[in-house]
C-alpha cells in the first residue's frame, strides 16, 4: 500500500471504502474502459453532453483504479461513492488538492447535466477532457511503476 495508506484504512473503518484484493486483470480492464471512454469523448459528431459524460466516466473509472491499486473500492452501499473515489485521489495517486477540487466540480456538473438536463458548454467539455487525459497519464505512469504496463503490455 502506498502514499495515503492510513487515510484509506480510516475511510474503510468509516464504511466509505471496502477492502478488496488488488487485481491486475481487473485493473487492466478498467484502464481499457477509461481509454475507450476518453476516445468516445473525442468523437465530435456526438453532443457535448454525451462527450462530457464519456470524459467524466473515464475520470471516475481512473479514480476507482487508483483505489484498486491500494486494495480498496468505494463502498457502493452508501451514497457518494463517486465523490469518495475522487476525493481520495490525493491519497491513491498523489493528485494535488486544487485538481481534486476541479474534478469534484466536474462531478457536480455531471450531476446537473445528468439529472437536471443542464447543457454542457464547450469550455466545460474541454476542461473535463483535459483532466481525464492528465489523470490517464498519471495512472499509466503508476501502472508502469507497478509493472502492469511495459513492453508488450500496453
Regions found by a protein language model. Give the residues of each.
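Terminal alpha-helical segments
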Residues: 1-154
Amino acid at each position: 500500500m502506498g502514499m495515503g495508506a492510513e487515510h484509506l484504512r480510516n475511510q474503510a473503518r468509516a464504511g466509505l471504502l471496502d477492502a478488496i484484493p488488488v487485481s491486475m486483470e481487473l485493473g487492466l480492464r478498467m484502464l481499457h474502459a477509461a481509454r475507450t471512454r476518453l476516445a468516445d469523448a473525442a468523437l465530435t459528431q456526438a453532443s457535448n453532453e454525451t462527450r462530457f459524460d464519456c470524459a467524466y466516466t473515464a475520470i471516475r473509472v481512473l479514480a476507482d483504479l487508483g483505489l484498486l491499486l491500494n486494495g480498496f473500492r468505494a463502498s457502493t452501499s452508501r451514497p457518494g461513492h463517486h465523490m469518495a473515489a475522487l476525493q481520495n485521489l490525493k491519497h491513491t495517486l498523489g493528485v494535488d488538492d486544487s485538481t481534486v477540487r476541479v474534478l469534484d466540480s466536474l462531478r457536480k456538473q455531471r450531476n446537473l447535466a445528468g439529472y437536471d438536463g443542464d447543457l454542457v458548454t464547450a469550455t466545460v467539455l474541454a476542461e473535463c477532457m483535459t483532466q481525464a487525459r492528465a489523470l490517464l497519464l498519471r495512472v499509466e505512469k503508476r501502472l508502469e511503476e507497478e509493472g502492469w504496463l511495459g513492453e508488450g503490455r500496453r
